[in-house]
């Protein structure tokens, strides 16, 4: 299959050295000025990220509290209770679909919500390691390019290699990856909306041990189907296929019992659809396993808290990096004097750290101001602590 492509008999590598004149002071200053604009954009973006994150977190927390106070659990999932029409309901049950999902090309058939075919091709992959050094007034860059063969699920474009000759990859795969999804999914009498079906993503590898080779030119080894003359010694261009599934929808002697999920959504007839809260958010929750309504909302609150802190950290980091880029020009102005340069670098980083911390806390306080003014005032006071510490250290250094 790989006769038209490069041999994979050995790993190959080569080294390339490039050089350019050492940049002068004005050139470095010009590059730093460009970085200031990028830093300013990053700095401003961080305010938007932090502020909107607080609004999102509070809206989500309010919606979850509202949902917990309103949710009801039907007596049975096998009948539709008219009194729950339009209400937020808590449903627990095994998934069920109307027909099998299949890939007839490989003889795969099973009851599931989703069936994924994952395709990989054996290809050349280029890796590079670079190092820079100064020699005779020149900045030299030494790059070592290494070529190895690996199974990859995406096409690796060998035209972008530093040296394509001897490392050529096919431009397309003979087989494509895809995911089949059941059109109708039920829990008892209730049909899941598309949004709930999308949340069923707990994919598990499908064992191919009991399947036969579907064609003469396809060989099964372990949990892969190989389009190869010899799977033990693949060549560039060879393809292997594996399968995974999510949401087993019927008891199976090999795969186990049907998958059980817990859903919290709005009941509309026999449909489970998104529920709109008073705060303008929507509730459409699916958890894998059997959970009470209280457990589901507790898990969602924990997830919301983790996401909030993660975005706060990302906002702080963006602000810190933006300030570093904006103040980099001061470092460039003194980089000709090694000792003073290092002191300035430490001072600028400390300045960026203090300012980023203070502004992050103030932005968080502004986000909370409308909803929780007392907490906002407390955070605002904490935000002043780094600035006060920084200011009290300055006179001390002058006295030294």
UniProtKB/Swiss-Prot annotation:
InterPro entries: TMEM43_fam. It comes from the Eukaryota. Residues 53-313, 367-368 are perinuclear space. It is a multi-pass membrane protein. Widely expressed, including in the cochlea, heart, eye, brain and kidney. Residues 2-31, 335-345, 390-400 are nuclear. GO terms for cellular component: endoplasmic reticulum lumen; endoplasmic reticulum membrane; Golgi apparatus; nuclear inner membrane; plasma membrane. GO terms for biological process: innate immune response; nuclear membrane organization. It is found in: Endoplasmic reticulum membrane; Nucleus inner membrane; Cell membrane. The keyword Membrane applies. The chain crosses the membrane at residues 32-52, 314-334, 346-366, 369-389. Pfam families: TMEM43. One of its GO terms (molecular function) is identical protein binding. Its main location: endoplasmic reticulum. Keywords: Acetylation, Cell membrane, Endoplasmic reticulum, Immunity, Innate immunity, Membrane, Nucleus, Transmembrane, Transmembrane helix. The modification N-acetylalanine is found at residue 2. May have an important role in maintaining nuclear envelope structure by organizing protein complexes at the inner nuclear membrane. Required for retaining emerin at the inner nuclear membrane. Plays a role in the modulation of innate immune signaling through the cGAS-STING pathway by interacting with RNF26. In addition, functions as a critical signaling component in mediating NF-kappa-B activation by acting downstream of EGFR and upstream of CARD10. Contributes to passive conductance current in cochlear glia-like supporting cells, mediated by gap junctions and necessary for hearing. Can form oligomers through the transmembrane domains. Interacts with EMD; the interaction retains EMD at the inner nuclear membrane. Interacts with LMNA and LMNB2. Interacts with SUN2. Interacts with RNF26; this interaction is important to modulate innate immune signaling through the cGAS-STING pathway. Interacts with CARD10. Interacts with gap junctions proteins GJB2/Cx26 and GJB4/Cx30. Belongs to the TMEM43 family. This is Transmembrane protein 43. It comes from Mus musculus (Mouse).
